[in-house]
């Protein structure tokens, strides 16, 4: 049996060793997980687990991000297309109003330069 007076000596001996080993034990799972993730690959980890549920959640999260990104790109393309259309219309209106053709007028609803006599589109 161990005597009570030996307990403090035992604690003084093993406590520093335990404290030195704790960081190594703490880092071992992280090193094992990062070893499976190679450079250049996309590694997604949710909570550090490799169970099928966390993989499915990561897949769904990635899929949702991809869909959001795709929609964002569509919206940006639409805005850019509308801006270009309006920009061309402003240039066409300026050209129509500065035209030497006295019968040319700008139709704001259709955003075209038309001939007053025939109603046909003209290029000033």
Swiss-Prot record:
Organism: Yersinia pseudotuberculosis serotype I (strain IP32953)
Protein name: UPF0482 protein YPTB2194
Similarity comment: family membership: Belongs to the UPF0482 family.
Signal sequence annotation: 1-32
Transmembrane segments: none
InterPro entries reported in the protein's UniProt record: DUF1283
Alphabetic keyword roster: Signal
Impact when changing residue 21 to I: In strain: 487/90 / Serotype 6
